[in-house]
Amino acid sequence: MTKYLFLVGRIAEFGLSCLNCAITAVAFRIFVFVFNNLLKHLQYGGPDGELGASLRYFSQRYTMPTNMAKGLLNDIATEELAHLEMVGAIVYQLTRGTDAQIVKDSGFGDYFMNHSTGVYPADSNGVPFTAAYIAVSGDPLADLAEDMSAEQKARATYDNILRVSDDPDVNDVIRFLREREIVHFQRFGEILNSVNEAITAKNKFFMSK
């Protein structure tokens, strides 16, 4: 069985106590799969998918008030792009080598007519990706709160995929991605507290006696 080896970006493990970021690299193997109609449940370009996450974090980093916040957003955005590549590999491997009868029987026809077995950024209903999925307010606290919500939505999406998937190889990848979303949620919570403290410190006023 052919294997695909992906380097899952630069993963930022943020230590709240020492306020340092240790950048590590993680490798993950993706196996070639047989055709599976699970494609309709995968979100290569959905509202809570990896593409939106990477663009959101790359765009938000510029207005972060601390270098640590900028670095964390950049690192997680980079990792999300690696996750997007992994999801794209799954979509392609689930659909390549299909024949006309499989396309007709599986409900894959609408997608196939437009994209064949190409990997197109759309949600599970075939709706194309749009920048309207991402939020960039320019307010660091609002954006980081949005990021925490986005990670929970991504985790919930992977939970839903695991409920309907009967492919153990696919499930291994989805579980890995789900775990990373949980870690991202925790890191964003930590950096939100740090940024809030930095902003509050600048707004303190002292009155002389």
Listing of model-derived features with the role each one plays in the protein:
Residues 1-9, 18-209:
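Non-heme di-metal
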